[in-house]
Amino acid sequence: MIPQRLVMSAFGSYAGREEIDFSQAGPGIFLVPGATGAGKTTVINLLMRFYDIDRGAIYVDGNEIRQVTRDSLRLSYTMVLQETWLFCGTVYENIAYGRIGATREEVIAAAKAARIHSYIETLPDGYNTVLSDDGVNISKGQKQLLTIARAMLSDSPMLILDEATSNVDSRTEILIGEAMNELMKGRTCFVIAHRLSTIQNADRILVIRNGNIEEQGTHDELMRAKGFYASLYNAQFE
């Protein structure tokens, strides 16, 4: 399931009204870069129906999104957010939460794909190690990798990554990047970030600025256009 057409209208501080056509797109990676406050997270809030637009429409598989129940819609998405969420329970339970009925072999395979298995093996009780509430007894990067492992188990066809490499050291960022590449295989992905280290992998890039979609295209197309995206990219990699 991928959005076939998004028309986003005025809602609160998000004053843009743009149409994004995904009708020809299959599984792929759509990066939404831009400055903080540009409206990137609003795109995700609309896709998840955390709130509804007041004008325009969002279509998913040909169905207007407001005609799809929130529960049904959200089963189609897996999210990895900047603010991770872990509960008081074992490492195994936190990963297995990604899919009801997952086997131990599947949980371990997900942890390996998420580049967190080796770390788990160093814990006092391995996968049976109990995490404190919200995982405060492990690092930010380790929490992020556990969240990615949980997402690995999900069967949902769409993935939303919101600032998934924020506030981690360079080594952990590399591990998270590798884990995300595994996670994104075969799914339609929306990656929201202003760090553009993996931007070249995106099938389509949406550049949101001041609440409007200012540019869209591939990395090469946007670099040739020499617009806001090109200036943002060059500023980060000079």
Describe each PLM feature range.
Residues 95, 99-100:
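A short, conserved alpha-helical patch in the ABC ATPase nucleotide-binding domain
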Residues 45-50, 74-83, 91-94, 108-116, ...:
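ABC-family ATPase nucleotide-binding domain "signature/switch" substructure
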Residues 101, 117-124:
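Conserved H-loop
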Residues 1-42:
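Extreme N-terminal "head/tail" segments of very large remodeling/mechanoenzyme assemblies
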Residues 2, 13-14, 26, 52, ...:
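Short flexible coil/turn linkers enriched for glycine and charged/polar residues
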Residues 54-57, 210:
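Conserved coupling/switch loops of ABC nucleotide-binding domains, chiefly the family-specific signature
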Residues 56-63, 73:
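Conserved ABC transporter NBD signature motif
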